[in-house]
Amino acid sequence: MANPTVIKLQDGNVMPQLGLGVWQASNEEVITAIQKALDVGYRSIDTAAAYKNEEGVGKALKNASVNREELFITTKLWNDDHKRPREALLDSLKKLQLDYIDLYLMHWPVPAIDHYVEAWKGMIELQKEGLIKSIGVCNFQIHHLQRLIDETGVTPVINQIELHPLMQQRQLHAWNATHKIQTESWSPLAQGGKGVFDQKVIRDLADKYGKTPAQIVIRWHLDSGLVVIPKSVTPSRIAENFDVWDFRLDKDELGEIAKLDQGKRLGPDPDQFGG
């Protein structure tokens, strides 16, 4: 089996291309999930203040037999804390029992309140202090990103967005790439594969490679140059989602999956959410 791939970010830091997402997992569930994930080979864990499970993540990491330097931990600044990023980060660090965060993301731009530039400036300072290795955003549209860059001169290293075969966001993905912003996919399986896993192209590729539909979709993300964080608390699925390093999709196969794009957003609209 090939080794799990890593991505070099524009700030020089490196992150695993495949990680474990823990949205909707309780503190208890997340401990077991992370233990399993680390055993399987995951080294990247994606949580958020809004998930209310940072304490569980912290306990799991405290008990882990993996060195901190080998781990890549992401958490996120919630919408209510755009004017107090320092306090929010310190609270997250305390719950996670960590001295620093590998990647701190602003969870949503919340343009109705319009404090996201102020929040970004605060995150820049926290990075300078060494409390954060890398800083990025989630759910930012092109105009939000351009404003951050114009007003601060600092470009996010990551833009984590809803991205799956039904919602491929190719224009935003391309814009991110042009500006050396790595695109990261949340809800990469389209909320459990609804409308994706039953597609003929996905089923045919699963048969061809002896893989599950979920593994085909995860491989599609990887071969499209995306960072991907499928969420699960089920041990068998956590292992299944990581067993994707022994095959690759070719250009024609990626092209067939590209045809599934419907622009179908399953989550909130970033221009409307919050506020």
Describe each region flagged by the PLM.
Residues 1-71, 122, 189-190, 256, ...:
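N-terminal binding-site loop/beta-alpha segment at the start of enzyme catalytic domains
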Residues 2-7, 55, 59-62, 88-91, ...:
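Alpha-helical scaffolding within the catalytic cores
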Residues 25-28, 46-56, 78-85, 111-114, ...:
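Acidic-and-aromatic substrate-binding clefts and catalytic sites of carbohydrate-active enzymes
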Residues 25-38, 81-97, 143-146, 167-168:
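Short, acidic/polar
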Residues 44, 100-103, 134, 158:
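Residues at the N-termini of beta-strands
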Residues 68-81, 103-109, 163:
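A short, structured active-site edge motif that brings together acidic residues
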Residues 85-106, 125-129, 150-151:
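CE4/NodB-like, metal-dependent polysaccharide N-deacetylase domain
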Residues 109-275:
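Beta/alpha (TIM)-barrel catalytic core signal, keyed to glycine-rich beta->alpha loops juxtaposed to Asp/Glu
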